[in-house]
């Protein structure tokens, strides 16, 4: 088989992977705090006894785009937005801590605070508020509750959000969509980040996704055309080999 087929096949495979990343970004264009996944392709020279005239294509995923999203003022007390390097802490399915910029906090049936189904972690563990109470969140993450029918002066703190600070190159997205520390960051800062009292939040505000839908749609069209071109290359090479075999059989 001609080596050109392997080259085009590898490029087509990586184009499909790039299309999957683009589709995932587009699907999360309305997810609060979402960070677009970056994807790139690079050429890898093929080493061997012959001349270095061919290259293969491999994916290079540098991480996520940490550009802040647009702030949307919702006036909802449980919506919070963080500083650029701030992260909310939630409990992942495996019990470990995960980090997110999604500040759309919900109250579960038992009063537990959650974000996308993950329990919100406070400085003492998962946070639970009294059922039916009016919740407010201060700039330092302190959560206060006012029970129904009680006078305003009886509002009392029930917990405090665990707010941590991590730069974009210190975290990476996991398969569950949550961010976790990279191996290098864990070696330097430990397996679990400590709460950072300098982080401040804004209540009643949500940070939107930093995905640009128009650009994502354009990328999807470009990926589709690139894949089609690579399929044509494979077809052309296969047809040329077929004609060459016919000529050899006639001689």
From Swiss-Prot:
UniProt record similarity statement: Belongs to the flagella basal body rod proteins family.
Gene Ontology annotations for the cellular component aspect, listed alphabetically: bacterial-type flagellum; bacterial-type flagellum basal body
Superkingdom per UniProt: Bacteria
Signal sequence annotation: none
Subcellular location: Bacterial flagellum basal body
Biological processes annotated in GO: bacterial-type flagellum-dependent swarming motility
InterPro entries: Flag_bb_rod_N, Flagellar_basal_body_rod_CS, Flagellar_FlgE/F/G, Flg_bb/hook_C_dom, FlgE/F/G-like, LlgE_F_G-like_D1
Keyword rRNA-binding: no
Protein name from the UniProt record: Flagellar basal-body rod protein FlgF
Oligomeric form and interacting partners: The basal body constitutes a major portion of the flagellar organelle and consists of five rings (E,L,P,S, and M) mounted on a central rod. The rod consists of about 26 subunits of FlgG in the distal portion, and FlgB, FlgC and FlgF are thought to build up the proximal portion of the rod with about 6 subunits each.
Keyword hit for Glycosyltransferase: no
PANTHER family: FLAGELLAR BASAL-BODY ROD PROTEIN FLGF (PTHR30435:SF18), FLAGELLAR PROTEIN (PTHR30435)
Keywords: Bacterial flagellum
């Amino acid at each position: 088989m001609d080596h050109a087929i392997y080259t085009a096949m590898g490029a087509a495979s990586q184009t499909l992977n790039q299309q999957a990343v683009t589709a995932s970004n587009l699907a999360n264009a309305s997810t609060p705090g979402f960070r677009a996944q970056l994807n790139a392709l690079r050429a890898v020279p093929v080493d061997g006894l012959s001349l270095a005239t061919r290259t293969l294509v491999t994916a290079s995923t540098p991480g996520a785009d940490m550009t802040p999203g647009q702030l949307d003022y919702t006036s909802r007390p449980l919506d919070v937005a963080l500083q650029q390097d701030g992260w909310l802490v939630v409990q992942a399915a495996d019990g470990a801590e995960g980090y997110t910029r999604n500040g759309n906090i919900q109250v579960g049936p038992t009063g537990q605070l959650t974000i996308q189904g993950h329990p919100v972690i406070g400085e003492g563990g998962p946070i639970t508020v009294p059922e039916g109470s009016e919740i407010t969140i201060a700039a330092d993450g302190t959560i206060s509750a006012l029970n129904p029918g009680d006078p305003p002066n009886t509002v009392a703190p029930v917990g405090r959000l665990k707010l941590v600070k991590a730069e974009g190159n210190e975290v990476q997205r996991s398969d569950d969509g949550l961010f976790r520390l990279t191996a290098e960051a864990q070696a330097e800062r430990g397996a679990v980040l400590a709460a950072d009292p300098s982080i401040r939040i804004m209540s009643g505000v949500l940070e939107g996704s930093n995905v640009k839908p128009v650009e994502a749609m354009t990328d999807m069209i470009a990926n589709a055309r690139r894949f089609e071109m690579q399929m044509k290359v494979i077809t052309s090479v296969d047809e040329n080999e077929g004609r060459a075999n016919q000529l050899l059989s006639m001689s």
